[in-house]
Design a protein with these regions (language model features):
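Charged/polar, low-hydrophobicity segments characteristic of intrinsically disordered regions
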Residues: 65-82, 188-194
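Active-site-proximal, Lys/Arg-enriched surface segment
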Residues: 81-165
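Short, flexible active-site-proximal loops enriched in glycine and acidic residues
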Residues: 49-51, 62-75, 92-96, 110, ...
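Generic alpha-helix structural propensity
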Residues: 32-36, 44-47, 51, 75-82, ...
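Electropositive, glycine- and tryptophan-enriched low-complexity nucleic-acid-binding patches
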Residues: 143-206
Length: 209
């Protein structure tokens, strides 16, 4: 639990420093509350914000949210989205680095080491939103038939993996979004190049292959 407490503390500090678009001093939830509330949804493995809220209202998992995250109340999903959507995901990159550092220091990466001390880093594109109606400026698009446009969000996920290992270690993702100064749509291969340029050198100490 000490490692988990330190990592949650790191996440709390990261969320506390997130840019806040709200004006005025009457704030019911801090940005740390907002960020940790979103994270608790995934940590508690709830299928949706609504299901998460209902579970807490019914007392299920409330003690865990209070003990682990210090959350007495969970903001509504709309409130969380309104404050987190404008935040650049890069703000969370230090937390990924902290996870890797903790695992290195505690020997948690030993099970991922391959012959020669190498680790396997898998880069793979994935979509996490697809809609024919709901879209935004950061959406990519594709045609489905003559008259149908499909909008989607995609990202390049980076993970430390190992054969026969049922867990992975997530690294900083790279989002596949329209790039300033580029007329062509962004794609997975360009995201791979950006990820290597931004993060490759820092991860060389892991001896990746």
């Amino acid at each position: 639990m000490k490692i988990l407490d330190r990592l949650i503390g790191s996440l709390r500090g990261c969320c506390h420093s997130l840019p806040d678009i709200r004006q005025g001093g009457d704030v019911r939830y801090t940005m740390a509350d907002i960020g940790l509330s979103a994270f608790s949804l995934f940590f508690m493995q709830s299928p949706s914000f609504l299901a998460h809220q209902r579970r807490l209202d019914e007392g299920q998992g409330r003690s865990n949210c209070q003990t682990l995250f210090g959350l007495d109340r969970i903001p509504s999903d709309n409130h969380i989205r309104a404050l987190l959507d404008p935040v650049n995901p890069d703000h969370f990159h230090p937390v990924f680095a902290e996870v890797v550092a903790e695992l290195e220091g505690s020997g948690g990466l030993k099970g991922f080491r391959q012959p020669g001390g190498h680790v396997l880093i898998a880069l793979d594109g994935t979509e996490y939103h697809v809609s024919k109606k709901v879209h935004c400026q950061r959406c990519s698009t594709r045609q489905r038939g003559k008259d149908t446009t499909e909008h989607f969000h995609a990202m390049l996920s980076a993970t430390i993996v190992a054969p026969g290992h049922n867990r992975v270690v997530p690294l900083e993702p790279e989002f596949i979004v329209p790039q300033d100064g580029h007329e062509k749509q962004d794609c997975e291969s360009r995201a791979v190049r950006r990820w290597l340029e931004r993060h490759g050198r820092r991860h060389t100490r892991l001896k990746p292959v």
